[in-house]
């Protein structure tokens, strides 16, 4: 009896693992890590809260547009420029703020402390593009402390100063604020937009049409037809 060739099954198994990993990574990159495919099918593009629900909202500013984003969100990264242009069109008295998703157990929430700490340090916007690139292009896990500390050092951010800021009252308050908003509005995908406490919008059209839609909600309390 001839010897069996064990190489072929091993090769097929290795190929299967590689292909499976590639598919899983693509799904994580292009689908929000906070929502399963089934959940995404159930999400509505626009939800209006009742007056009672809006009044109980943890959002501090009633005349505001808030984006709930995540560093690991591909669509958040590519739309930064569009959001800057939209923010420049906001009328006087209206504010725009970006907050990181913060939900227990959500994979994309693992960098909420990084966002909050750098924000309190006053340097978050300066490093945001680099963080997007590190996570989405270089696949660096900045949610792991040791890896994050190495990245901080590489980018000339004082690790001791970061650690001190991360335990400050200001950082904890910001984390609590983000967690309350993420939970209250049941944010299940990023980016999610909260308008004047009462509207929750997901992107349902391309920019700049989506900017017009958000600005209409901010200024006129009126959604635009697609």
Residue spans for each PLM region:
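Extracytoplasmic thiol/disulfide redox context detector
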Residues: 2-106, 179, 220-226
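Alpha-helix capping and helix-coil boundary motifs
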Residues: 5, 33-39, 139-144, 205-210
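Solvent-exposed, acidic/flexible segments
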Residues: 62, 72-79, 104-111, 120, ...
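Tryptophan-centered motif/residue detector
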Residues: 70, 86-87, 138, 151, ...
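Extracytoplasmic/secreted proteins, especially bacterial periplasmic and envelope-associated proteins
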Residues: 78, 82-85, 109-113, 126, ...
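Structural microenvironment flanking redox-active thiols in thiol-disulfide oxidoreductases
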Residues: 90-120, 124-153
């Amino acid at each position: 009896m001839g010897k069996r060739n064990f190489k072929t099954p091993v090769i097929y198994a290795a190929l299967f693992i590689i292909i499976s990993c590639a598919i899983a990574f693509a799904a994580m990159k292009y689908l929000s890590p906070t929502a399963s495919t089934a959940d995404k099918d159930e999400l509505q593009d626009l939800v209006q809260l009742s007056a009672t629900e809006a009044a109980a909202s943890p959002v501090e500013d009633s005349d505001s547009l808030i984006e709930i984003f995540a560093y690991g969100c591909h669509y958040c990264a590519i739309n930064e420029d569009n959001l800057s242009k939209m923010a420049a069109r906001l009328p006087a008295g209206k504010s725009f703020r970006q907050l990181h998703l913060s939900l227990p157990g959500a994979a994309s929430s693992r960098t909420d402390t990084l966002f909050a700490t750098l924000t309190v340090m006053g340097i978050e916007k300066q490093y945001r593009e680099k963080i997007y690139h590190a996570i989405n292009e270089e696949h660096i896990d900045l949610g792991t402390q040791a890896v994050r500390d190495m990245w901080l050092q590489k980018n000339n951010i004082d690790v001791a100063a970061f650690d001190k800021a991360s335990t400050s009252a200001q950082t904890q308050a910001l984390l609590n604020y983000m967690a309350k908003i993420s939970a209250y509005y049941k944010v299940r995908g990023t980016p999610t937009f909260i308008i004047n406490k009462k509207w929750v919008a997901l992107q349902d059209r391309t920019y700049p049409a989506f900017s017009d839609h958000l600005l209409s909600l901010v200024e006129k309390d009126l959604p635009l037809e697609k």
